[in-house]
Each structure stands twice: as structure tokens, then as C-alpha cells.
């Protein structure tokens, strides 16, 4: 399909997280967080590299202790992906991480402590050119805000963020981004909509503690989708109680669905019914597994019968329409050849890879021309 996205992104100030631009006209960055023990350097490095292979732009790493800060330094030396140090409670850990090297510091207004501690972090970040993320979370609001509002509300999240933004402003520090996360979709969306009109800094989106793989993916798709449709959001994290790689995959699927960023294959597949001329579900599962390594944006239609098959296949780069006795393959929107069921997956995979390689050559040539 060639319907253009109607989304007009919110204007925001651009910052750099390592070599990755965030905000402005930069692509929306997709990030995740390690769930290894940070002091286990080898395991953490391995997970970061796996996330990088999955397409992560940025990875956040929890740094709960000084020992973890030293481990973080070793991790940073072994990876190329920008790393965000996740700091809670002890501002001195942030100072140490800034000293040993980090691409961004995440601090939580609800537990980082007094203003003088925030000032110390700002000073260290300014000296090293490190951006800060003000990461507000509904589950850890300041005690006075909990008392004032009685419970987490969008207004409480925004007030928490604005307090710390005021501190940054008074110290002439504009190199920051903001997040306001809750596990409730409506609270999160309302908070982001409020603050989007008050500041020009980039916004990092997320539904915190969203749930397991299925429920968390759905909740995140709805919440982030609502904000992204409004043009709000410069970087996203899909929080799942699952393999962090799934966070990256779901994140890209959300952006792909809204035509905000393309990576890998966009499958158009029917849910199957008794009219199918091949096993659609089995074929789709096999193709997705085999083609995970392809990063080139490509539309692939997999439709089990001739009701909608030809129409969908004509709009895709490569299409498969079920038929009897043979299935019809479309290339570039036109019927090309037929395939029998016994050779379907292998031959169709080969065709998709060939088409992806050709398209990547075209994209590379365009980039080379500038």
C-alpha cells in the first residue's frame, strides 16, 4: 500500500546520545535495557551485542552500585552502541559513571535527592558533554507530590519533571530529554501531551511495567501509538517482561505500522480460513524465523487464496497468492511465476532475499549520491 503517513512530528531540540541523534528531524530511536547482572561484564556485553544485531539504537544499563559503575566502564570499552546509565538514589554513582565514560545519564527525580545533588550531576554532565534524561515514573514520585495529589496523576508526573527541568534551566543546561512513564496508558498519554506543549526537548516514550510479551506489546502499541499519531516522541522503549530483543522487534513494528521508520520485512498476511491453498500460519512462522536477519525495508504479502490475494500482492514488493493447483508469485506488483506447496517456503525465501539485496543496492546507491 502507498498511502502516505499523515503524522506531523512535534518540533524538538536535537541532542546526541553517543553518535545517535535524538530529536529534531532524526529518525525515532528504538532502545531497550539489559536485564543481566551489570557486574557480569561478559553477559552484559553479550546481551548488548545481541540487541545491536536486533536493531537497537541505544541501550540502557542499570548501575545500582559503585561496583556496577566500575563494571559499566569495562562494558563501555567493549561495545560500540551508545549506553545510558540508569541511576537511582545515589548521585555519586552518576558522577563516577560520568568520569569513566557514558553516553547519557538517566536520573529519577523521585529518588535522586536534594537539589545540590542534581547540581553536581549537571556539572559533571556539562564538563563531559553528556546528555541527561529526566526519567519520571509514576511508581516513584517524590513524597510531597504523592501527598499533594493523593495518587499518581498526569499532573503529578508533569510537575515532577518540570521541577527538575527548572533546575537544569537555572544552570543553563539544555542537553537533556524527558520521560514520564506510568503503567496506565491513559495517564501516560495525558502526561506526555501536557509536557509536549511546555518544553522543546526530546521526549522518550514508554509505558512502564507494561506486562508480559503479549499484554505488554498490546498496551505499548496502544499507548505509544496514540502519542506517535500526535507527532509526540523522539525515542521509544517497549517495556516487556520478556527477552529484551522482543522489545526491539515490537518497537520497530510499532514505528513500521505508523510509517515512521522502516526496518526489515513488513509482512501482509491473512489470518487463514478454509479457502487457503497452503498452510498460511505455518508458512508465515517459517518465513519470519528465516528472514529475521534482513534489515532492508520490504513489503511481502502472504495470502492464502484469490479473494484478496491478487489485490494485496499487487501492492507489495513480493507477493504470494494461494491457488490451485499452484500458487502465484508476484514481483513488483505483477504476476511472475507459480510455485507448488512442496517447494514454497524455500523458493519464496530465496526470492525475497534476492529482492531485498537488489533494493539495498538501490538504497546504497542513493545514499552514495547524497
From Swiss-Prot:
Tell me yes or no: is Iron among this UniProt entry's keywords. Answer: yes
EC nos? 1.17.7.3
Q: Name one GO molecular function term.
A: 4 iron, 4 sulfur cluster binding
Where is [4Fe-4S] cluster annotated to bind? 270, 273, 305, 312
The role this protein plays is:
Converts 2C-methyl-D-erythritol 2,4-cyclodiphosphate (ME-2,4cPP) into 1-hydroxy-2-methyl-2-(E)-butenyl 4-diphosphate.
The pathway where this protein functions is: Isoprenoid biosynthesis; isopentenyl diphosphate biosynthesis via DXP pathway; isopentenyl diphosphate from 1-deoxy-D-xylulose 5-phosphate: step 5/6
The protein's organism comes out as Hahella chejuensis (strain KCTC 2396)
Pfam families with a match to the protein in the record: GcpE
The UniProt entry's sequence similarity note says: Belongs to the IspG family.
NCBIfam families documented for this protein? ispG_gcpE, PRK00366.1
InterPro entries named in the record: Dihydropteroate_synth-like_sf, IspG_bac, IspG_bac-typ, NO2/SO3_Rdtase_4Fe4S_sf
Q: Which cofactor does it need?
A: [4Fe-4S] cluster
Designated name of the protein: 4-hydroxy-3-methylbut-2-en-1-yl diphosphate synthase (flavodoxin)
Q: Where are the transmembrane segments?
A: none
Q: Which GO terms describe its biological process?
A: isopentenyl diphosphate biosynthetic process, methylerythritol 4-phosphate pathway; terpenoid biosynthetic process
* Catalytically driven reaction(s): (2E)-4-hydroxy-3-methylbut-2-enyl diphosphate + oxidized [flavodoxin] + H2O + 2 H(+) = 2-C-methyl-D-erythritol 2,4-cyclic diphosphate + reduced [flavodoxin]
> Could you tell me the gene encoding this protein?
ispG
Alphabetically sorted, this entry's keywords are: 4Fe-4S, Iron, Iron-sulfur, Isoprene biosynthesis, Metal-binding, Oxidoreductase
